[in-house]
Amino acid sequence: MHAAVERFLHSLSGHASPATLDAYRRDLTALARFLEASGIDDWAALDVAQVRRFMGAERTRGLAPRSLARRRAALSRFADHLVRSGILDHNPVALTQTPRQPRHLPRPVDVDQLARFLDTPHDGTPLAVRDQAMLELFYSCGLRLAELTALDVTDLDARRLRVVGKGNKPRQMPIGRRAQAALADWYRLRGQLAGHDEPALFVGQRGARLGHRAVQKRLAQLARERGLAEHLHPHRLRHSFASHLLESSQDLRAVQELLGHANLSTTQVYTRLDWQHLADAYDQAHPRARRRAPPDDT
């Protein structure tokens, strides 16, 4: 079995880096040893059940999802080689699922830190007023970057915002008082940058709709200028919106609607609560966790 692995690696030697070949060798050697321990000494006997057992054993051994996904990719490429060589008639690895990668969510900005950041005075120029309106709208509505840059002036009225999210799903969002005030300031100055025929809500110095990269750069620059000691990007403001709202309201369904998530499970992952908050909620709500007054000794 090990000879077949070496032949496969040799066939890749002109196309793969030494590091990739070493990783493939480790992954395939681990599979060969697993099969040999099960009494299998021929690659022709490899089937989907054995692949699943091997991946399960590796998961039990503590391999991280990223490592499991890499290992599965190596096995699949080797199985394709076995099919081309006539040893297998199909790739059994292709019938298994890729291990799910954990979602690495941005840490929400502390509520007080974010309030100080948003309340920092600016110089009142059209660009500064525009930036303040963008910041307030990001945090007030939890918008995605693409949703904010796609906004037209006609998408807003005094207290409500119309957004077209992922999958062309429309939703309506309430606008907080601070964001309303910041938008009113921007409306008064927007005409100094935007032409009469420009529909975009947020425009740059040349009067055209702001692009994604321009907004990302402005947020990072504002964080530095205002002394926010953390990297700031649109998704982090969205996550802060969701986390702060959920911590205050405990209404997961409402947060799901505001974020524009199709599935509640997405919101549950996206808006994780800190452990202390969950523990406090448990202590207050669960009948066997509530603290009772000590018995009267008299």
UniProtKB/Swiss-Prot annotation:
It is found in: Cytoplasm. Residues 104-283 form the Tyr recombinase domain. The active site is at 144, 166, 235, 238, 261, 270 (o-(3'-phospho-dna)-tyrosine intermediate). InterPro entries: CB (IPR044068), DNA_brk_join_enz (IPR011010), Integrase-like_cat_sf (IPR013762), Integrase_catalytic (IPR002104), Integrase_recombinase_N (IPR010998), Integrase_SAM-like_N (IPR004107), Tyrosine_recombinase_XerC/XerD (IPR023009), Tyrosine_recombinase_XerCD (IPR050090). Residues 1-83 form the Core-binding (CB) domain. GO terms for cellular component: cytoplasm. Keywords: Cell cycle, Cell division, Chromosome partition, Cytoplasm, DNA integration, DNA recombination, DNA-binding. One of its GO terms (molecular function) is DNA binding. One of its GO terms (biological process) is DNA transposition. The keyword Iron does not apply. Signal peptide: none annotated. SUPFAM superfamilies: DNA breaking-rejoining enzymes. PANTHER family: PHAGE INTEGRASE-RELATED, TYROSINE RECOMBINASE XERC. Forms a cyclic heterotetrameric complex composed of two molecules of XerC and two molecules of XerD. Belongs to the 'phage' integrase family. XerC subfamily. Site-specific tyrosine recombinase, which acts by catalyzing the cutting and rejoining of the recombining DNA molecules. The XerC-XerD complex is essential to convert dimers of the bacterial chromosome into monomers to permit their segregation at cell division. It also contributes to the segregational stability of plasmids. This is Tyrosine recombinase XerC.
